[in-house]
Amino acid sequence: MSDLLPLAAYNLNIEPYTPTPAIDVTTPVTVRITMAAIDPEALDDEKNPSTLRIIKRNPDYDDEDDAGGLLGDYDEDELDISEEEEEEEEKSKSKKGKGKGKSKKQEEEEEEEEEDEDEGDEELIEIDTDDEFQEFVLATLSPKTQYQQSLDIVIAPEEEVQFIVTGSYRVSLTGNYVKHPFDAPGYDDEDDDEEDDESYDEDEDDYLTPDEEADLEELEDASDVEAKIQELVEKEQSKSKKNNKRKQPEPEEEEEEEEEEEEEQKLVEETKKNKKAKKEKKVEFKKDLEEGPTKKEEKKEEKKEKPKTKVLEGGIIIEDRVTGKGKACKKGSKVGMRYIGKLKNGKVFDKNTSGKPFVFNLGRGEVIKGWDIGVAGMAVGGERRIVIPAPYAYGKQALPGIPANSELTFDVKLVSLK
């Protein structure tokens, strides 16, 4: 079964005493059934166990062969005539029998025997027609003893297969629609025809026109052939030289082309510079958080003061990189933050640099203790680095990307305050 490639899930509900086709006509795909399960809800008061049966057409049964064997080479008109002749013969025989002096009882007994023979023939015909289908039991399921039964049945679309359930419970079949190796399209005769056409076309290319054949006859001599080839080569060379001379541009045209190329190059460089400037604006905040304020100009660098460093409760260190404007946040303030969290070795384990800011109520225990202490006092637009010892971070607790007893460094920026 390893060659069967699952395509989709297969499910089929079978109601009691309702023959159900295994494959729908609208989806002619091979199925593999792997499980039969009983619905524990009974559909009648008897609550009899449900038996699942598979009904399939007998491959040895053939309607056409049987009909052909019976009819032979006769047509319908000949059969009708022969039936009429047989009826007349039977009537004449019955008259002769009566003329021979048979009693009424004997005649009645003979008629009963004939009727019995006819009934027997009908039963035989019914039995023969029953052989058209084969029935097999797959499983008997009951809520009291067995809810489900594993199966492994593969059914192709060309097979005429139905399922039927006898009992008080419906049965559900599950499995997969699968791609069977035999489902692959066979070798098409049209491919042969196409290949023959291609080979025929190729052969046609090898044939020569009458003019070409005449030229070959004229050049029977090997020396003539060589001379002709030499002439053709010289003609081709002279043509190529003329073309090269024509293609050489004038000096003025070259200068104009160079000027146009320079202008295009300038435009490309200007657009690149504009794009770079936009990108620098976008990532300016991110770079400030990760690497500190960028050094844009030497004059500004001289004027800037060094970040103010403070040590707070529990050894928490804060460095104010940029001082915000407005009122400072305090306990109970609702603050919106951008941040980048790093381990002591510089590895980033978490960040919020775009999208919706991280919002929390300061001093209410909604974040780690180091944040409640380290963020207090910041104003909107302020940027700060907070170094938090392990006891004021996650302590001995290990989280994804954060080992136990880790010292954490956060570069934060206050973007909103309520």
UniProtKB/Swiss-Prot annotation:
The keyword Lyase does not apply. It catalyses: [protein]-peptidylproline (omega=180) = [protein]-peptidylproline (omega=0). It is found in: Nucleus, Nucleolus. Its main location: nucleus. One of its GO terms (cellular component) is nucleolus. Disulfide bonds: none annotated. Keywords: Isomerase, Nucleus, Rotamase. PPIases accelerate the folding of proteins. It catalyzes the cis-trans isomerization of proline imidic peptide bonds in oligopeptides. Belongs to the FKBP-type PPIase family. FKBP3/4 subfamily. This is FK506-binding protein 3. It comes from Kluyveromyces lactis (strain ATCC 8585 / CBS 2359 / DSM 70799 / NBRC 1267 / NRRL Y-1140 / WM37).
